[in-house]
């Protein structure tokens, strides 16, 4: 890429650490590094969590199926992290119970029982209830299943608001001194004797040059592209891109249990209660080639998901019944596995020390992001005590078992605010909901009403604190209000951002 002459570039700060990529890995590293005394700059070419990190099945889980592939270390680490993350972010992470029906001809019951025994005991489970056997002929959540499914198991894992997990890590990093820049692309990286020189391009096209002693390449599906930019003389083909897609249906059943369905191809599909009125179903595992930006579910994937549901639920579904869908690409480390579903979900590092260090990250999962961040910083030589395992994320400074108590307190103090709306606010912001509602006594005090329980005060908070710059940032990532607001109501949010931009 042609370099701009120095006169056209604004020279900026000198950082200890430049992080390229605003997904969960980059966000977790930024948070951890700031408390270790490092000066940090994170750049993301779009919005935070705009790619893989907002396209997950939204689970903090041990990875039950990874036991089949003997990934015991990954499962153990994931189970330990599941408990830690639930403790530091109980507003956006909460327990779920999963029903695993036993289907004759697939995995035998003894194998499922053994796997779940290991799942209960590998990670020192404390906060979540244990596995139990269920008689699906009499259990309430067996009523929606096909008659052939008479027994199964019930076990625990956790839900997470995936994109909010990213945003809250970046918010905490910012409050500890990190420079978080969205809509900013690193378009060139030059290695000098003891420093990296990075050219950054903002959304308005303006260029800035920053210096960094270390660079972390956490660009997810674009990690090889960044490597090629930084080390153009070398060949970089470390990724296997695997596409995962989901469908969102109107509620398929009327209880709070999730289901894990085994398929004849040895894959699994989850059905999870979602956003009060919906059921989230996925995911797929499809080899992907091409540009990972802005991908959609394919007709074949939609049919695959529906077929999986129809094998287990009494009520058949079709792709046409879905109210929404989303797809993302998992940037997995290419380990030459024969199947996309058996490629390791563990993370791998590649570090180049021929001059100032460049650390590239491959793979990883939401559940292990915090541990990945610690390992990444240790790999770069930044040792220090582990602090992120106990320090709550913004809004998460209350016991994991006390969410309903917190909700009752807020409903008492702000009794005029709708009950479901209050639950949504507390599930998003936790104790920081106070920053939105403080000083208000009636809806009019919250400013313009956009529909549902969304008011201007919340939008302003998201702009001021959580890096939101567009309606999509708010409606699809910092919340899932796009599922609840009409097209007209969503247009009002877009108009608010447009007016704000014009006034700037």
Please identify what each model-predicted range represents:
Residues 18-20, 210-220:
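Short hydrophobic core segments
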Residues 1-17, 32-36:
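Extreme N-terminal leader/targeting segments of oxidoreductases
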């Amino acid at each position: 890429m042609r370099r701009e002459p120095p006169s056209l570039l604004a020279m900026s700060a000198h950082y200890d650490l430049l992080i390229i990529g605003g997904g969960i890995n980059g966000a977790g590293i930024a948070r951890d590094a700031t408390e270790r005394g490092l000066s940090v700059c994170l750049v993301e070419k779009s919005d935070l969590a705009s790619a893989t990190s907002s396209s997950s099945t939204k689970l903090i889980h041990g990875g039950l199926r990874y036991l089949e592939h003997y990934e015991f270390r990954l499962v153990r680490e994931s189970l330990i992290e599941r408990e830690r993350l639930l403790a530091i972010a109980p507003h956006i992470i909460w327990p779920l119970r999963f029903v695993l029906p036993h289907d004759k001809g697939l995995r035998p019951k003894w194998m499922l029982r053994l796997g779940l025994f290991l799942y209960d005991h590998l990670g020192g489970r404390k906060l979540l209830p244990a596995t139990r056997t269920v008689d699906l002929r009499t259990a309430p959540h067996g009523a929606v299943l096909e008659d052939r499914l008479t027994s199964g198991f019930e076990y625990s894992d956790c839900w997470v608001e995936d994109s909010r997990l990213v945003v809250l890590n970046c918010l905490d990093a910012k409050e500890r001194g990190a420079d978080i820049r969205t809509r900013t692309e690193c378009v060139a990286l030059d290695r000098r004797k003891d420093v990296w020189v990075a050219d950054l391009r903002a959304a308005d096209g303006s260029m800035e040059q920053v210096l960094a002693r270390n660079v972390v390449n956490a660009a997810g599906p674009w990690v090889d592209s960044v490597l090629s930019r930084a080390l153009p003389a070398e060949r970089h083909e470390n990724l296997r891109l695997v596409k995962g897609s989901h469908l969102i249906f109107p509620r398929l059943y009327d209880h709070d249990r999730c289901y894990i369905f085994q398929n004849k191809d040895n894959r699994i599909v989850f059905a999870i209660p979602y956003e009060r009125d919906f059921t989230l179903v996925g995911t797929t595992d499809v080899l992907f080639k091409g540009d990972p930006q802005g991908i959609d579910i394919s007709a074949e994937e939609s049919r695959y998901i529906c077929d999986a549901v129809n094998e287990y639920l009494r009520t058949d579904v079709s792709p046409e019944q879905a109210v929404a869908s989303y797809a993302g690409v998992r940037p997995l480390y290419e380990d030459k596995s024969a199947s996309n579903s058996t490629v390791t979900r563990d993370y791998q590092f590649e570090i180049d020390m021929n001059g100032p260090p460049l650390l590239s990250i491959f793979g990883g999962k939401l559940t292990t992001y915090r541990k990945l961040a610690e390992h990444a910083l240790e790999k770069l030589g930044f040792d220090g005590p582990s602090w992120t395992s106990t320090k709550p994320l913004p809004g998460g400074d209350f016991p994991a078992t006390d969410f309903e108590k917190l909700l009752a307190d807020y409903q008492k103090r702000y009794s005029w605010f709708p009950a479901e709306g209050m639950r949504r606010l507390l599930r998003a912001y936790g104790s920081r909901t106070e920053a939105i509602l403080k000083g208000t006594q009636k809806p009019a005090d919250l400013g313009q009403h956009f529909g549902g329980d969304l008011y201007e005060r919340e939008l302003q908070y998201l702009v001021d604190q959580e890096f939101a710059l567009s309606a999509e940032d708010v409606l699809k990532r910092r919340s899932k209000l796009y599922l609840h607001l009409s097209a007209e109501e969503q247009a009002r949010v877009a108009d608010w951002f447009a007016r704000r931009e014009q006034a700037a």
